[in-house]
Amino acid sequence: GGSAPNVISEKCVVKLDTRYWNNEDDKYLDDGINKLAAAVWAPGVTQTIERVSHSNAMPLSDATKELVAQITEAAKLEGFDIDWVDAGGASDGNHMAEAGLPVIDGCGPAGGEFHCDREFLRLDTVEERIRMITRFLSLI
């Protein structure tokens, strides 16, 4: 960017990390970004889009819902409830889900503030999650 808000810079770089719940939203967003990039904003100004990486959305399949139910039951048998959240994001699980495999992403210890310097792990959940996964494996 420029040296001040009212100065036009020689070069500007914008980096986006986009997340979405379904592939239709990805297409909508991608089309919108490309439309903005194709616009003429000022004489001599050009825009270039470079997509560095991409993962399709991770759909919640019936097979995955069954795994969620089984892991939830395993947690109850171990004496605690597990709270499921739609976390979004991208992992190798997105690729496996796209191939039709059931995927559970995030059965480990509880924590928060992911991917930043405030990220934390709740140590009091480590043992219970090990018990939960062990119980789940014994049930399948």
What are these regions (language model features)?
Residues 1-140:
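Metal-dependent amide/peptide-bond hydrolase catalytic core
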